[in-house]
Amino acid sequence: MDCKLHQKRIASVVCCLLLAIGMQAQSNQEWRDSLNAINQQIERSPYSVGLHLRKAAINLELQQWEFAIDEYKSILRHDEKNLTALFYRAYAYTHMRRYDLAKNDYNDILLEKPTHMEARLGLAYVYQLMGKRNDALDLLNIVVEQHPDSVGGYVARASLETDMKRYDEALYDWEECIKRDPDNTDYHLSYIDVLIAMGRKETARRELNKLSGRGVNQGALRGFYQRMK
């Protein structure tokens, strides 16, 4: 069982859900050009929250965490309940490993909006990074309860359960992921991974054969077959 693989998957899920800035992919130079243009606009409209949010978003794209945090602080001085600023400041704090500050921002969001899925996922991820996996699992249980139709909560919870070797629960959650997105090969492989960890190799082999029959790349399956020898 590759714990690092599951930790990376958790991070991937959270990042995809968190950093939904809605901006097009650009090169670093293009982002820098955009940043210069935004700075010029801010000079003309220094109190525009929208412009400061856009500038901070570009800072995030360039991984300029401190600059982004400064922008969000500026916004929050005038509007302490700006959820967007709190949300992405927490994201930046997480990248800087300032977990207590990230936790505080996510909690402030949840006080205002208890059903904010991305904030709760972000908080759960911070708890995992802090080594508080049981607390993280409690949060993910709430995410799934509040958003039963969203695959993201199930993926995050299943990944953590797998990492914690809570295989019965993980197997159920991977099944739920597959129900919601049956064409996602990664979910099927994660399900098979848990079956192998549980010693259910024949069931795992049947599932692998199904994937092979669907044309899934053999390179992705080879390691799983080898684990069952």
Residue positions per predicted region:
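Position-specific recognition of the canonical hydrophobic site in helix A of tetratricopeptide repeat
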Residues: 60, 87-94, 128, 155, ...
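Structural signature of tandem alpha-helical TPR/SEL1-like repeats
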Residues: 28-36, 63-74, 96-108, 130-142, ...
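Bacterial N-terminal signal peptides
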Residues: 12-20
